[in-house]
Regions:
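HTH-adjacent hinge/linker in prokaryotic transcriptional regulators
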Residues: 1-36, 44-52, 66-72
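Glycine-rich SAM-binding Motif I of class I
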Residues: 41
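An N-terminal domain-start capping segment
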Residues: 56-57, 190
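Conserved phosphate- and dinucleotide-binding cores of soluble alpha/beta proteins
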Residues: 63-192
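Residues at secondary-structure transition points
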Residues: 2, 6-13, 17, 38, ...
Length: 192
């Protein structure tokens, strides 16, 4: 878990505040998709113990953490497991994910430009994130301000327009926040 451990040690206070705010978006009985990002993984620290949910995830770590809650039904999407992220990827995972429906997808991203282009270098996982967004009534982007950059890198994953809400910290670039407002995307800014 060296990769996930190293990601989870960056901007810890921000990630925890973002994760805590994300919990407020859950309703008992919801069917949700939980992404494999370190910010999304922090949600388990704040979930009410007895909340009833159905959680689907490709993250092996998240599946095990959510499975500790008595009223959370966990569906772990299978497939080839990445050595770096400890999450499933590939055609088996994609096919299953495309057959499901979620009220909300909580998505973490590695990189987003000020104008809202989301990119990644994790080619196997890009298709899964796209499918989760497509299969969800609502998609929420969870990202600390360190993810915002000037230029895109690698492969396009999505755009800001694919999300109904962004939860980020108070150090987020003002041009990025203005872009969210212009696109009428709900923004929740948290203080670490």
């Amino acid at each position: 878990d060296v990769y996930m451990d190293s990601r989870s040690q960056i901007n810890v206070a921000e990630k925890k505040a973002i994760a805590k705010a994300a919990i407020a978006e859950l309703q008992p009985g919801d069917s949700v998709y939980i992404d494999d990002g370190s910010t999304v993984a922090a949600m388990t620290q704040f979930i009410p113990h007895n909340i009833q949910l159905r959680v689907t995830t490709t993250s092996m770590s998240a599946a095990l953490e959510f499975n500790k809650f008595p009223n959370i039904d966990v569906i772990a999407i299978g497939g080839r497991v990445s050595k770096t992220t400890k999450s499933a990827a590939g055609p088996i995972a994609l096919e299953l994910l495309q057959s499901m429906y979620f009220k909300t997808a909580f998505i973490g991203v590695p990189y987003i430009t000020v104008d809202g282009i989301i990119t990644s270098n994790a080619i196997d996982e890009i298709h899964l994130k796209k499918a989760a967004i497509a299969q969800s009534q609502r998609s929420i982007l969870l990202m600390d301000s360190s993810k915002i950059h000037k230029e895109p890198i690698n492969i396009k994953l999505a755009s800001l327009d694919d999300f109904q809400m962004v939860i980020t910290d108070s150090r987020a670039d003002s041009n990025f926040l203005a872009n969210c407002m212009e696109k009428k995307i709900q923004v929740n800014i948290v203080e670490p």
